[in-house]
Amino acid sequence: MAHQNQHQDTIDSTEVEVWDSRTAQEVNKSLYPPAVDSPFTLNTHLSAWRWACTIILGTVLVPVRVSCIVFLLILLWPVAVLSAINLPTQPTKPIRRWRKHLIKSALVFLFRLGFFFAGFLVKVKGKKATREEAPIFVSAPHSTFFDAIAVVVAGLPSVVSDSQLARVPLAGKCILVTQPVLVKREDPNSRKTTRNEILRRVKSKMKWPQILIFPEGLCTNRSCLVTFKLGAFSPGVPVQPVLLRYPNSLDTVTWTWNGFSGFQVCMLTLSQLFTRVEVEFMPVYIPSEEEKKDPILFANTVRIKMANALKLPVTDHSLEDCKLMISAGALQLPMEAGLVEFTKISQKLKLDWDNIHKHLDQYASFAVSSKGGKIGIEAFSRYLKLPISEPLRQLFSLFDRNQDGTIDFREYVIGLTVLCNPSNTEKILQMSFKLFDLDEDGYVTERELTTMLQAAFGVPDLDVSTLFQQMAGKDSDQVSYRTFRRFALKHPAYAKLFHSYIDLQAAYIYSLPREV
């Protein structure tokens, strides 16, 4: 890869370094090989020696650090309450300049002190851009809730956050101070609303705070950079990449859907002598005219820049892939290969997830009308209103388990239901049950239940007979929806899956990536 243009040498050292699109033309692909393992899993093995050290240090450090943090929270409470007075949850104009500087300076100091008490040693590289230079920060890789350090180091810019968090007593007040872009999970139009609000702010002549976005949309294990969502890139304005590194011999901070729990992450991290973290502000990237019109190209170029600086590969995994890991294990493919394959095929077909969401009920009607029968590629094409093409054949083959040229369209609809409604467990259960209640009498059989569970939740190798007897009783050969729902919501085997749905609803991707 060619080096950055030499004109940077003439820029005053106090200015923020800038990349424009011309200096990125040479970047066609990452310098590093593609990722193979799934970025959504974490298998950390602690040796006996590590466990012993952690327990000994934790016995001393955790009580001291927790006491210091609690004391700090007592100080933070009145500051946060006073700061949030008269601040609306959906601001229409920026807060006054004097108030912004006074409040944020106090909060930044207290938050930095809190991370210090928790044992974090923060190293900052590069120079933060001004709003005029870059209205948006994009930070990656996103691997833990401790990544909030980037928000603090950046001076508490606005963040994209769940509207529910604004109601949390202390955290909600602190979030309101940043004038966040709040996302309503229950609103099917949340993506469009969020995108429009970001666009309104960055294009406004008013002095809105800069916005910091984690474009990956979910936590990974930092082994690669997954597909970037397009919210930060759709406005077509300059962005400043912000890199996050945790150069520690033992990784205690990573929080993925099947790794350490949030409580375990906190306890393990507080039990370390210290935890290093590096926050690096990269040069501002100015998009070309082509990239302004094509946010996918813009996002991929920035992602490759960041990956090369981190010496990490990029991968076609996306947020939808992580949902598929939980919901579509029945694809009968090696997990990592199946995820990337689905993303690539979806990209080629230009699947519009907003449009799919609107047509779910229609798809369900088609599936129910088939009464459990198989459909071929022609009917599949007709249902999706897509021409028969090689990408469509590839998508079809993912669900054609025995390669006989037919699929059960109901399973495809259940998979789409999970992808489009990750936060609505009730909707998923209702749709699944409806599709397999062939005679519409409110009951399903053991065989139908087996297929439904595999398609809806990706739970392979279930002892279905035992499970069915637990749900229906020994003398019953069918299960009602009420019985199924009550069992599914209470059974421990499903609790983690439902919890994962809640964790993964943080955002959706606006589009799917091009290959790089």
Curated annotation (Swiss-Prot):
| UniProt binding sites for Ca(2+) 1 | 400, 402, 404, 406, 411
Binding of Ca(2+) 2, residues: 437, 439, 441, 443, 448
Q: What is the name attached to this protein's record?
A: Lysophosphatidylcholine acyltransferase 2B
Protein location? Membrane
Naturally occurring in which organism (per UniProt) = Mus musculus
* Biological process per Gene Ontology, one example term: glycerolipid metabolic process
* Enzyme Commission number(s) of this protein: 2.3.1.-
The protein's annotated pathway: Lipid metabolism; phospholipid metabolism
Q: Which gene encodes it?
A: Lpcat2b
Signal peptide coordinates = none
GO CC annotations, alphabetized: membrane
